[in-house]
Structures are given as C-alpha cells and as structure tokens.
Amino acid sequence: MDEDRHALFEKLLQQLDLTSEADQPYFQTATVDRLTVHEQSRRWQFLLKLPSMLPFTAFVDFHNHLQVAFREIATVEATIEVDQPELTNRLLGDYWEWIVKNSGLTSNLIQELCQSQVPELDENNRVLLYAQNEVVKDFLSNQALGPIESAYRRAGFPKFNIHVMIDESKSQAKIDEFKARQEKTDAQLAQQAAAAIEKANQKRQSQGDTPAAEGPTQIGKAIKGDQPVTKMIDITQEERSVVVEGYVFEKEVRKLRSGRQLLTLKITDYTSSFAVKKFSRGAEDEAQFAGVEEGSWVKVRGNVQEDTYMHDLALNAYDINQVKHASRQDTAPEGEKRVELHLHTSMSQMDATNSIGDYVKQAKKWGMPALAITDHADVQGFPAAFNSAAKAGIKMLYGVEANLVDDGVPIGYNSAHVPLDGATYVVFDVETTGLSAIYDKVIELSAVKMEHQNVVDQFEEFIDPGFPLSEQTTNLTSITDDMVAGSKSEEEVFKLFREFCGDAIIVGHNVTFDVGFMNTGYQRHGMAEISNPIIDTLTLARFLYPTLKSYRLNTLAKRFHVSLEHHHRAVYDAESTGHLNYLFLKDAEDRYDIQYHDQLNDHMTDNDAYKHARPNHAILLAKTQAGLKNMFKLVSASNVDYYYRVPRVPRSVLEEYREGIIVGSACSSGEVFTAMMQKGQVEAAAKAKFYDYLEVQPSAAYQPLIDSGLIADRENMEEIVRNMVKLGHDLNKPVVATGDVHFLNPDDYIYRKILIHSQGGANPLNRQELPDVHFMTTDEMLTDFAYLGEETAKEIVVTNTQKIADDIDEVHPLKDKLYTPRMEGAEDEIRQRTMDTAHAMYGDPLPELVQHRVDRELKSIIGNGFSVIYLIAQRLVAKSNKDGYLVGSRGSVGSSLVATLTGITEVNPLPPHYRCPKCQYSHFYTKGEYSSGYDLPEKDCPECGTLMIGDGHNIPFETFLGFKGNKVPDIDLNFSGDYQPIAHNYTKVLFGEKNVYRAGTIGTVADKTAYGYVKAYERDTEQTFRGAEIDRLAKGATGVKRTTGQHPAGIIVVPDYMDIFDFTPIQYPADDQSAAWQTTHFDFHSIHDNILKIDILGHDDPTMIRTLQDLSGVDPTTIPMDDPGVMGLFSGTDSLGVTPEQIQSKTGTLGVPEFGTRFVRGMLEETHPQNYSQLLQISGLSHGTDVWLGNAEELIKNGTATIANVIGCRDNIMTDLINFGLDSETSFQVMEHVRKGRGIPDEWQEKMKATDCPDWYIDSCLKIKYMFPRAHAAAYVLMALRVAYFKVYFPIIYYAAYFSVRADDFDVVAMSQGKTAVKAAMKAINDQGMDASAKDKNLLTVLELANEMLERGFKFKMIDLEKSDAADWIIDGDTLIAPFKAAPGLGLNVAKQIVAARNDRPFISKEDLAKRGKVSKTLIDFMTENGVLAGLPDENQLSLFDDLM
C-alpha cells in the first residue's frame, strides 16, 4: 500500500517537474496519503507524508511547483505530515514570514506586527513572541496565533503553542534583527520562485502549448474567441480561470529584486474595473510587456484572488491577448458628414469631461470636416483647440455658450399714460397643471379688485382641465380633482375675467407667466389678448430693492409684513400681491417720482438690472478674425462688468460687438426653445428674430424636461422640435441639429455625473437625471431625427451644419510671434547705460574680451527687439533699490553682461578677473584657473596700488538667449515680499493701467480631489467600488476646470500699439470681483510666446536683508564674499562658538538660505567647501535632479572627482567642454540636451571622447534629468553669504530678523523656558519620524534655530503685554521678546488689533484686553497661564478716572 502511495508521489513529482536527483533527497519515502477533490469549487487537497522536515527552500520550491502545475484546473492545498517532526529556532525562523503571509490573516496591522519579528524557543522549548505592551499581546493572542499555529502544522511541524511575552526592549531588538535578516533572504527566495515557475512554463510550452501569435501582443497562450467573457461587474469573489476583456487605462512595469518584471494593468469594461498582474518568465515576456499600451484593449485569462498588497480582488493573469474592440463608426459618405456646432470640453467648469484634443481626434477619425468648441461662458479651450485642429488638419470653429440676459426686464407692459395713484387694480394669480402655456391648463383663476389698498371685489373660479390632475399638481397647488370636476370651461371663465377687469390696471407677481397662460387661452378661443396696462411686482421689487437675496412672494410678504395665509392658492396670493403692489408703487413715487404707468420702465436698466434678468443660453461663433476679437470683448465684459453668479452678456452689449459673430439659439436653456415649449409659436417667433440660426437637440437631451414634467412626453417633445424646424423655415433661418455635447462616449457619462454630484445642491443639475449627451456620429444623429423624415433630418443634421461651418473664416486665436511693448528710446538707453557702466568698471577703451562680449550681447538684444524687456527690468530694480530693497535675480539673467551693467543683476558673467576701482585696470583668467572671481586672493593694482576687486563667474551668454541669441529673455526677479505689491503696481505707472494684467491660471481637478469626489459618490449612492474602478473613475474626472487664479509673480504687458483683446479676454481671478488685479482669461502658458510676461516674485531673502540692514546699519553690498568666519560656517561650527553636539548639526548653516536644510547640510558635511565657487557648485547640485545622489556624490566619494570639477550647474557643461577642446556650438547643444534630461546622441559622445573630456564626465551627463542655471546659483549664494555674515557678527540681530521674517510656527513656551525645554520639544518631533505633520516639521526648523541661539548665550522672553510687537521679535539686550503672533492660534490681524488698542490706552483688565484687543478666552487663558497678564484683574473696575480714559 505504501509502495502504491509512494508511486503516486513519484508521479506527482514528475508532473511538478521535480525528478532530478537534486530534488529527490527529501522525498525518497514520501507518499500521497489522500487527495480530496472538490469539483464545484475546483479545489484539490493533498495530504502528503514525508520522512523528515523539509528545509524551507525545498518547501517553497515544492509549493511553487505545485501551484504552477495545476493553476489552470484547480486551486491546490497541501498538508504535510512528518514522521519525525522537528522544532528548532532555525526552522521556526526560516518558515516564519511565509507562514504569516499564508495563514489567512486579513488584517494589515496583524501581519505587520507578526512580520516585524521572529519567534524563538526558550530553554523549556516554548515558542515565544514579544509584545511591547498588554494591548499588543491581547491583539496577537486573540487574532493571530491560532491561524499561525495551524499553518505551521500543515507545513509538517509538530503541534505547539505560541506564547506572547511583554518586553519592550526585546520586542524592538527582534524587530531590528528580523529586518536585517529579511533583506538578506528576500532575493534568494524570489529567485527560487522565479526559477521554479520558469522551469514549469518551459516544460508546458515544450509539450505543445499554443505558440505566440504574430502581430498584436500576446503574453501566454492565445485565448479562443468562443471562450465566454465575464463582465467585471459580475465578479464579486475569488474565481478560477476567468476571462475578461477591457480597455487599458493604466500600465506599470516594475523590476523586482529577483530580476523579473511585474506587469500591472488596470483595465475596464465600463461595468467595473480590475487590476491585472503578470510576472515575467523571461526576456520574451518582458518584450511583450512593452507592447501592451495604455489605450489598447486586451483579453485576459487568469485567477481572481484577494491581493494582500492591494487588499482587493485582483486578476492574476496567465494569458493576456491584445484584441481589437468594436468602436463607434461614422458610415456617412464622404462629404455628407455632420459638423458638431455645440460642444463642451473640460474647460466648461465642472460640467464636461473630455479635452478638446479628444474630440478633435475623434472627429478626424470619423472624417468630419469641422468642429466647434462652445464651452460655458469661457473660451479657455481655444489655445488647445487651435493646436489640436492644426495638428489634425480639420477646421476649428471658435465659439462660446454665453449667458444672454436682457439689460433690464420691464416692470410695466402695455404702457399707458394713466395715473397710478387712485387707479383701480385687478391683482390676479393662476394655478396651472404645469409650466407650459401651450401644453398645460389653468385650473384656478383668482383675482381681487383693489382701490386705495382696499379690496372692493373678488373673482375666484376653478376650471375643469378635462383630465385628471397629477399628484405633483395637487401637492403644489392643494387643488384636487373633486375641486375642479364639473367646473366652468376655460372659455367661459376667461370671458368672465375680462368683464371683471374692465379697464383696470392688471397686477401680478411674475406676471408674464400668468399673462402668458391667459393670452394663450384667449388665442385658443379666438379672443383678443389682454390690452390693459400691466404691472409685474417681481421686477418692481428687484428694481426697488436690488440687494434682497430672494424675491419669492412669501419672502417679500414676510419682509414687508403682508399677510399670506396660504401660499400657492390663487386668491390668497393675489391679495398679498395687491398689498405689496401698493407699498412698492408708493416707494417708487417717493424715490423716483414715478406717477404714471408709462414711467415704470424709464429706470428698468438701473440698479444692476442685468443681475435680475434670467440668463438664457446662446451660442456665439466667431465668423471672422474681427468677430473673434469681439468675442474676446464680450467674454471680458461678462466676466468683469456683468458677472453675477455667472458671467452674463447683456443683449445690448452683444448687439454692440455682434460684428463678425454668428448667434445661435442654443439648447433647451435658450429662450427660443423655452418660448416654443411654454408660450407657443408666436412668442418663439418674436424671440427667434434675434438669432442667425436655430438649434434642436437629439431626444436624449430633452429627457430631463420630460422627467420634470415641463414636457408631457416624447410625442410633445417631437412636436416642439417640428415646430422649431417650421419656425426656421418660416423665418428663413437655418435650423441645425446639435448635440449639446458634454462627453465623448456614452460610457463617459459617469464621469460627468460624479463631477455634478460633487457640487451638491448648489448645482441644479443634481435635481434631475443627467441626459446622455455624448459626441454623436452622423448616423446616430440621423437616426435620432428620423421622425422628421429623411429629407428634413439630413437638412438639419448635415446640410445646414456644413453650410454654417463653410460660412466661417479660418480664425486664429493665437498669434504667431512675440509682441513686445515699446518704450521710446529703449535701444539707445540700454546701449548708453551699458557702455557708461562698462567704461566706469573697465575703462575706455574696454578690454577686448569685454568689448566683444558687450557688442555681441547688444547686437542680439537690440536686433531682436529685446531692449524694452531689459529696460523694464532695469526700471523695476532701480526703483526697488532706491526704495531701500535689494533685488535678487533668478534664472539665467545673470548670464547676461548687459543685465549686470544696467543694474538688473549683481551677478557678473565674465570670466574670473581682477578690476581696479580707481584706474580700471583689469586682468582676466580665461583658461579655467579659477571658477569665480570671488575666490581670487587679495591683490593690489599693479598700475596704481589700489586693492583690486575680484569678480566674474564665467557664465556663457548662450544659456540666456540661446546659441543664436534670439530666444525670448525670461527675466525673473526676486523682490522683497513686502515690496512685491509696490513693484507690481509700478508696472501700471510704466505702461498704463489698461496695458498690464496679472498672468491668469486655470485650476483643474487634481488626482486626489477626483479621488475624493469618487469616494463621496460611492458613499452617497451606497455603492462599493473596487480600487481599480475608483482609479478609473477618478482618472475620468481629473483635468476638468475647477477654478481660475493668478500667477503669484507674472505681469503681462500689452504693447501700446495693440490691446489685450488682440491676445486674450480678461477676467478676475476665481471670479472674485473685489480682486485688485484683472488677469488674462487664457492660461498664461498659452500666450507665453505672444506677449511679454515679467516675473516679479516675492521672496524672503530681500526682506531679510532689508531687516538686517535696518537693525544693524550695515550696507549689505559692502559685505565681503570671502570672509573666513563666514566661510567657516559651511564646514563647521567654530564661527558660532558652539560645538556640533550643542546645536545637533556639524555645520553652522542652520537658517542660512539654501544651505540650512538637512539635505544640503549633509552635502556640506561630505564636501567641506572652502570658497565661493564650491558653494556655487553645491547650490547647483542641490537643485538639480539626478545630479548629486547617485552621481556627483559617488564620484566625490570614490575619488574620481572633487567638488570643484563635478558638474554642478548647466553652464559648467558648456564651459567645461570648451575647455576640453570641443567646439562651442556642440558644447552648447550638449548642455541643452543634458539639462533637460535628454541624454547625449552617440555622434556627440564620439566628439566628446575625441577631446580631453574624461569618460566619467560623459557618464555623469547621461544620468542627469534637470540642471540648475549657474547664474541663479550665484545669486542665491550671494544672498546666503550676506545673511551668514550677520549670523556670525551680529547674532542677536540675525535671530531677531530670522524669527520675524522667515518663521511662522513657534513653541513660545519652550523657547522662553530655555534650551532644555527646546531640546525636549525637538526630540518629541524627531521621535515622530515620517509621521510628523508639515506644521511640526516647520516648527522643528524654528526650534533648531532657537536652540542654536540659546546655546550661543542669548535668551527668549515670553510675550510682554507692554513691549511685544504684533509680528516682530524685539531686541532687549541679549534677549528677544516674543511678538503677540507667537501665541498659539493668535493670527496677525488680532495681534495688530492688540497693539493698536494698547497704543490707544493701556489695558486695565483681562476683560478690557478681550474686548478691545478682540482676544478669545482661549488666548486669555494661555496668556494668564504663562504670566503675560500678571497683575491684571479679570474684570474692569469702576474708577473715578474712567470718564477721562
């Protein structure tokens, strides 16, 4: 029997491909004792008997082969029983991690707690684990130990129990030991697993697996076309051998430590989504991995399993086939394709999902000749539309869906010169079955006749509509079927009402609604419309009281104390309206002398009447280039002059700028369709005359109107559309079928739904089911309008849309060149300033090197029209310097000698040199002897004996304006944050207010925000999404316009020979009408190459320098750049008089700009810089990407290079290569490629190798992803050394400035208690490690400086009620007094209020402080606890002198 069982085991080994001698030793007498097959769940359970324990590596090898061999037919489980089981520390430890992972523990926390250590045997052979406390012990004992013990027994171990002991120190030691051990074994186990799987796969393939197909990517076997495909939404639990088909929306290939690759795809079939994982089996798989692309469709076969890493179901694939997926096709013949004229992109704020590029690509694929973009109230998609259309070669039509409003809504209708005082009024109200005068009926007509505010007669009649009332009607009006059944007919009641009215003035609230129903009824019965004078109390109230938030009848009644007993019953509404009418007319007479009915509309455009007009959508298309500019003016006016909740376009303003614009009637929110739906053809015809063409939409677009009852049913909807088409024919206006498109494909509907849901009740679209408004093919649109007949359908879908597209010119929303402003004499002034300063510094004639550089730069600057850019920068810097604030340069402007000579930057780009300030003698070092002139040793002038100045940083001009000198200069300037608003406003002085704007930005939905929207939607709709589905939905919602803003520094300058509308519309940032600056409507990146942008940045360094200068009286420009004490900070702490241990830093650069972070301090510790040029190198290295870590750092460590000659800044590459012997043009090209992370082409590498360029230099270049400009680094180091000078020689002034200017977060209690308390606070934050909050990390930086100051012998004092400033730290001898702002939770405004109140008169009590200083009880308590309010009573006390205070 045992022989049979052993034979079974031998057969099993053959199936597992474990038959070599190396695999056999542990299995010589092994048997298969039992095999249990669960057919329904496809699970096989082996019971195996082995003579002895398997070493862990053999166990894992066997387990992996077992899983691979049967993976396509069953899930395999194996239980091992061992004749002589062992229990040793080694076996326990070897198996531990695998056991924990495979014991069914579902909690991440439990797995982490278990895997962080390894159990051990004590002297009594007990298995012990250690816990840090009782809570952890209970947690492990109750939830982890049982499954783990069982898993060990299934692996062949003897039965044992694990005992948890509490020992904090041992627990930590075990964790550390385990981590070290785990790192050592991970790679080995992964390699063994990979080898096992590879071996098994090779065997199966050699036994006749289907060969890989050519063409589309195929990983694994081919999946037969007849194999059933499961919908992802139907997969809710683990399953074997499932086939799914999906769109790849995310792909990642990751290299594992074992050397294999892991392919992870996220795919969707639009019912749900799945993460698919596949491990490579060799180079062939890895090549196929590269062939799977995002945007393709794949068919996948594999097992659905719970992924312990993702904590979600995932599809572990064994076969992935790229497949063709059926997509929508436009089969209309060429020349008969429709043109979409109403389309929203992701620039329609929070309402549409796809970019214009998506639509253009689809339109091109379908062969459509043109496409319109018509976003809601903005044209921010135009730049992308222009570029996409040009690339695709289709015509782009530029439009906008405007919110059209009447300039003012009439108060009176049927104007008549009749006196209002003493007139008879009939105030009436109707109740109806709906909102459409055409399709709904009046069911109650009530009125009161009033004279001198008294009711003199009453009219009240129900009308039988001839059909049962809906539940909605009864709920809204309180009118039931019983009340209207058997009532008089509409015709009879309307006749009676006319007799009742006589010649009285008719009044109603929103009277156009009621009159609309009445006039439609009169028309229906062949009677004349109402001709009496009419007053609308709704528009009258809006005119008289424009600041009210609501004008509903019940709200107004409450506001003016008028009784309204039962709102939405006609007679009660009428009487209340009558009383309001009396009050309003009396007020109108008193304020505006309105005495006659025909005076009511004299002021209807007053008081921002456009705000109260109902916006109607209208499509504006730019027909000509002039029309585009007019459109820009309209969009600007709507955002700047007529913004109220949404940007509005008054009808008169549209008329003013209508030239070159085609106006369409838009969607169901347009006034023509609304009139046709609610008031009929006569009213619609009157509205339609304003438009150039009329629009109708497919049936899905109107479904919300049917759902809400505004349209009775589809039949009525089709009738309205027929009437719209007829109206177009009657008026000789083209009617076009448009999609009102909001997303590309039907499956994209959910993305828009999530966006709308995120806005809550604020968006009315949340109150209805959203329509399916996807981008339709010609076939789809023709099918939808088939009810109109084939000829008419083709006319509105194809013929008319093409005609409108053909009538529109080719329009260009972007310019093709840069338009710079003009400043009279700019060229001459720049040349003169340059030469004057050059001669003052270097003499006349100039040295040849200087003359050549100046000539070359001036030729480039003046020849390309850049003089004005330089002059603007010069004026800004000069004004700031004059006002007492130094300006730091950013970027590459320091590469320009002209910028230096005109005072724009302090950085001198010439080669290192001496120059004499007295006789202008100079000597240059041009062969790389020095990197910076600041490093030159002191030397007297050989001509006159004066101490010479060292200058020059060897920066090529090419890095600023390009090799040909024609690149638009981008001059970035660092102004003091305090001075930045003044500098911004100074541009208005230079160019005029209408020629300068802030650079606009567009904020879109970010990944994390979209994720939040999806999670909220999931919660509110009570659904559960897989992680991959959440990722898919979030991806669909990202990139959509959410808000607008402004660049913090960018100022756009419009040349005086053009206006802003030649480039872009304008608006306020984030629609904030109170903002100080208007911004460009287009994102400034879109027009960067067309119009000048000046970056006037706000920065702390210039503010810090100004503060230090004010406190010390030292001119920062006189500070030497080679002071030994200052330079010592960068390599030690001696200059501060403290040890590294005292300040917990090996350098003294805490708080020194650019050199105070842990990362840079670490660089300083490794490099020990000794001079300016080495600091410049470190500045460049610290700002680059892949420049220091894994690159320069390694070269310095292994002695290949030094800090002096590694590549620190981008400019080094060009100058180094020229010094190595490479030609200047190739040197420039290499620099440009390397700084952008593009590597170096082989031909250039060969050129480099032919020079003196070392191999390590080329290798270093190839690793770099981004490099910092040398001029920028030079400016930063310059500021840093100035600040550092004060830190060394004026310490208390330095710390006062630092804490006042650069610090925001304080622990004023710890700081005032001394260094022990500060060190404790630092330790508390450091102990949090990565869990420390951003606020705590900022506080740690402040505490490090506070500790340093205390160690240097200075002190902090708690807030002083009498001495403290609002925000600045006050110097009091060797002590800094904390400002009020340092108190936790006390903001700057309250701090200023306290100081202002104190300056007014001293505080006499805590009550007084709270009242006059606006200080909260929490802050009063804080001040009391910390002695700030010592001696101050709680409450005010009566005093004889109170009246004098």
Curated annotation (Swiss-Prot):
Coarse class of the primary localization is cytoplasm
Query: What Gene3D superfamilies is this protein classified in?
Result: 1.10.150.870, 3.30.1900.20, 6.10.140.1510, Metal-dependent hydrolases, Nucleic acid-binding proteins, PolC, middle finger domain, Ribonuclease H-like superfamily/Ribonuclease H
Which SMART domains does this entry report, sorted A to Z? EXOIII, POLIIIAc
Pfam families on file: DNA_pol3_a_NI, DNA_pol3_a_NII, DNA_pol3_alpha, DNA_pol3_finger, HHH_6, PHP, RNase_T, tRNA_anti-codon
Name the GO terms of the biological process aspect: DNA-templated DNA replication
Keywords assigned by UniProt?
Cytoplasm, DNA replication, DNA-directed DNA polymerase, Exonuclease, Hydrolase, Nuclease, Nucleotidyltransferase, Transferase
Reported EC number(s) for this entry are 2.7.7.7
Please tell me one Gene Ontology term that the record gives under cellular component: cytoplasm
* InterPro entries for the chain: DNA_pol3_alpha_NTPase_dom, DNA_pol3_finger, DNA_PolC-like_N_II, DNA_PolC-type_N_I, DnaE2/DnaE/PolC, DNAPol_HHH, DnaQ, Exonuclease_RNaseT/DNA_pol3
Which reaction is recorded as catalysed by this protein? DNA(n) + a 2'-deoxyribonucleoside 5'-triphosphate = DNA(n+1) + diphosphate
Annotated region (Disordered) at 193-223
One GO MF term on file is: DNA binding
Q: Where in the cell is it found?
A: Cytoplasm
State the family it belongs to.
Belongs to the DNA polymerase type-C family. PolC subfamily.
Say what the protein does.
Required for replicative DNA synthesis. This DNA polymerase also exhibits 3' to 5' exonuclease activity.
NCBIfam families hit by this protein: dnaq (TIGR00573), polC_Gram_pos (TIGR01405), PRK00448.1 (NF001688)
Classification via HAMAP family: DNApol_PolC
Write the protein's name: DNA polymerase III PolC-type
